[in-house]
Amino acid sequence: MDLQSLTYLFVGISFTLYIGIAIWSRARSTNDFYIAGKGVSPIANGMATAADWMSAASFISMAGLIAFLGKDGSVYLMGWTGGYVLLALLLAPYLRKFGKYTVPDFIGTRYYSKAARLVAIICLIFISFTYVAGQMRGVGIVFSRFLEVDINTGVIIGMLIVFFYAVLGGMKGITYTQVAQYCVLIFAYMVPAIFISLLITNNPIPQLGFGDKLIGSSTYLLDKLDQLSIELGFNAYTDNTKSNIDIFFITAALMFGTAGLPHVIVRFFTVPKVSDARKSAGYALVFIALLYTTAPAVAAFAKINFIDSVQKVEYESAPDWFKNWENIGLIAWKDKNEDGLIDYSSGNALEGIKPKYTNEQGKYGERKVANRPDYSNKNEV
């Protein structure tokens, strides 16, 4: 069975599981629809909260950001993890105790001010729409990747599926669906990380393999990444390029922004008691940490694999994933020196923010782009 068939099989099985759970646990009352009848156990709620928190931004973008930015990408780890700690310790239990479902409701009641409530609502709308835009883009990328459709089509498919789950099951159905989703998500994330860690460092624990020596070599993985990055014209992978004040304010913005997300806050109302809300927060932090501590390792493995797979490789011999990404618009190659080799280094390959594809193919079979090449550097990807 080829890779595409296996992808369809496993995705089909997971969606069948989600649909079955959504039907089995569908909401039968208003209480079920909005707060799952306050009958969810702390462990199940912790898993559902973790699945909520670790959406497309974490599952797809976290490792990608760290791979692209190097050590500077750690601000996103600190910001998103810190945001959850802020929410779990200082917001959610007290909102639950106060009896309000949202931050604007709490602020309006606590300060006896409709104006304060309105300001909080406006802030929350901006935060939520910014967050949802990223999530839906991530959904589109995932569906475009395995269905081989346009990203915009992938976004529409994802919206329809989410609408189906939300309307049918309400919070009760979504909660138990997300418990299953967390199990599938963490399995899908950890298994490749473990095997890649074994292949690269002979260490089965990605978090430790990240700082280990390369297999058959006395060179550490991060030292090798630093060396390759400098050779290609980038900053060393483990160097900071941002100032401490930038790091502080980016981390703070992420913390305060994500701490107020309504779809996560409402999770703390689905358990029977305030003490259970605190317990579920602790469980969720453990479940989230499992992925977040693996993300830097996945980023390093992906970066070194990307460089080894494409640098100075003939386009016709490029890995299948490279051409698949090209077909769905995730990557572009412009042969600036017309030698047929992929040359990856620092700088922009093309003029403009993103590639503008034509319907033509180049002489090596690559997708042609309308953008003019940027000849100020050697990068072709």
Which functions belong to the PLM regions below?
Residues L6-G20, G79-L86, V119-F129, I157-F164, ...:
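Lipid-exposed faces of alpha-helical membrane segments in multi-pass integral membrane proteins
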Residues M1-F59, R117, A166-G169:
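Membrane-interface "cap" regions at the ends of multi-pass membrane proteins
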Residues I21-V40, Y94-D105, K114-A115, V264-G282:
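Membrane-helix boundary/linker segments in multi-pass transporters
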Residues D2-L3, K38-V40, A44, S61-V75, ...:
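Loop-to-helix junctions at membrane interfaces in multi-pass transport proteins
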